[in-house]
């Protein structure tokens, strides 16, 4: 049976349009959450919850006990930096030549619309005669904090399986590198720049630190690749200098995380390097830590956390992955089994909580955050069928 007739395709498209029409930069996702709540309640979801951060969670309960499958998608987007660069209004949801245009179409309101509708269709077609529970979650603040708001979702749901809806061109993702933001600080002694010998220049100390860090060899994983450590910015204090020897300097590094790496194992080689530098040159004073982020949620609450988001990887031969592939093959889909090249909420579900997790989403990864972002309507329909098949695979 083809579960996605023309009326249902239109329903998915209309829901995606409605979500796109709601501007939802990080911390301002309330409008999208309200639209999802409206759709869920209109279609008989058993429960709709909005947590302290503003995550919205819909639940459909099967008639028999069983596993819990959670479909996760973030509902925040990056800002539109230059509206004049857009041919189509980023918040109108215009359809042109088989493409739906707008901020968040590919990243990732199209996926959220598709799996929310798929849950509705699955419940109706089965008359809820399935074991277990389906949850769909619209998660906030992912663009700032991959996985931090998702912690609240998994505490509420306690899922057995998670499906991340991030863009994959409808291929199946079974892992990703994680990400950490590492801060290295050097501390000097201020002095007038006319008499620099009376102070200690924190920037010169940082130059030595940066050069030493460049000598570190990245760890490597046979599937996920290198645990890259890349310098992304340096700032000194005071700035502007105004004839003052800088007494403080801060460098930020982007570190890509591999499976099994911990906060301690990631910082240890940098700390050892700093200890060696400080032992050789008493003028150098330095420390290393993870960046801490704090953001305001649309609910008024604050979300906060260290910027450390673990990597994760499952085996293609794991039973739950094979079950999913079997159902996808049954509807004529033959996805590649690969890994995401970017960080997702899977950092929490799989990396921190150890929950069986896969990713599948519509559209291309490289359309995220672009001017004139779009999603092909054919991809919306295809992934809706995929999510329906995955529900069948996990809830049996």
Cite the ranges covered by each PLM segment:
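Glycine/serine-rich anion-binding loops at beta->alpha junctions
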Residues: 98-114, 192
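Acidic/histidine-rich catalytic neighborhood of metal-dependent amide-processing enzymes
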Residues: 108-176, 181, 395
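Hydrophobic/aromatic beta-strand patches that form the interior of the parallel beta-sheet core
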Residues: 69-71, 137, 161-163, 282, ...
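Metal-dependent amide/peptide-bond hydrolase catalytic core
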Residues: 183-396
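Acidic/His- and Gly-rich active-site-bordering loop/insert found
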Residues: 1-101, 124-130, 364
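Secretory-pathway/membrane protein signature
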Residues: 1, 6-14, 18, 42-44, ...
């Amino acid at each position: 049976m083809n579960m996605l007739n023309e009326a249902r395709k239109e329903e998915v498209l209309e829901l995606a349009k409605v979500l796109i029409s709601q501007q939802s930069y990080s911390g301002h996702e309330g409008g999208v959450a309200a639209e999802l709540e409206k759709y869920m309640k209109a279609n008989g979801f058993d429960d709709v919850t909005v947590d302290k951060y503003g995550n919205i969670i819909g639940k459909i309960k099967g008639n028999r006990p069983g596993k819990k499958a959670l479909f996760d998608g973030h509902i925040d987007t990056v800002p539109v930096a230059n509206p004049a660069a857009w041919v189509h209004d980023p918040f109108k949801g215009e359809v042109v030549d088989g493409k739906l245009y707008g901020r968040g179409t590919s990243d990732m309101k199209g996926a959220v619309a598709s799996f929310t509708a798929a849950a509705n269709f699955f419940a109706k077609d089965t008359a809820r005669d399935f074991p277990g529970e389906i949850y769909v979650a619209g998660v906030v603040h992912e663009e700032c904090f991959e996985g931090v708001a998702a912690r609240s979702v998994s505490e509420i749901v306690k899922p057995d399986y998670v499906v991340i809806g991030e863009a994959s061109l409808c291929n199946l993702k079974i892992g990703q590198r994680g990400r950490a933001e590492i801060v290295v600080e050097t501390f000097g002694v201020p002095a007038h720049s006319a008499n620099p010998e009376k102070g200690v220049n924190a920037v010169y100390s940082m130059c030595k630190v940066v050069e030493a860090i460049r000598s570190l060899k990245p760890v490597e994983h046979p599937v996920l690749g290198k645990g890259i450590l890349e310098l992304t910015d340096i700032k000194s204090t005071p700035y502007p200098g105004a004839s003052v020897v800088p007494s403080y300097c801060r460098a930020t590094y982007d570190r890509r995380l591999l499976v099994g790496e911990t906060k301690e194992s990631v910082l240890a080689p940098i700390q050892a390097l700093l200890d060696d530098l400080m032992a050789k040159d008493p003028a150098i004073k330095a420390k290393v830590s993870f960046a801490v982020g704090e953001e305001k949620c649309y609910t008024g609450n604050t979300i906060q956390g260290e910027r450390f988001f673990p990597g994760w990887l499952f085996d293609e031969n794991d039973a739950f992955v094979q079950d999913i592939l079997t159902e996808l093959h049954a509807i004529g889909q033959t996805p590649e089994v690969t890994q995401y090249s970017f960080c997702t909420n899977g950092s929490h579900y799989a990396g921190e909580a150890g929950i069986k997790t896969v990713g599948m989403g519509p559209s291309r990864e490289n359309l995220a955050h672009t001017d004139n972002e779009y999603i092909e309507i054919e991809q919306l329909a295809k992934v809706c069928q995929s999510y329906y098949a995955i529900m069948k695979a996990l809830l049996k």
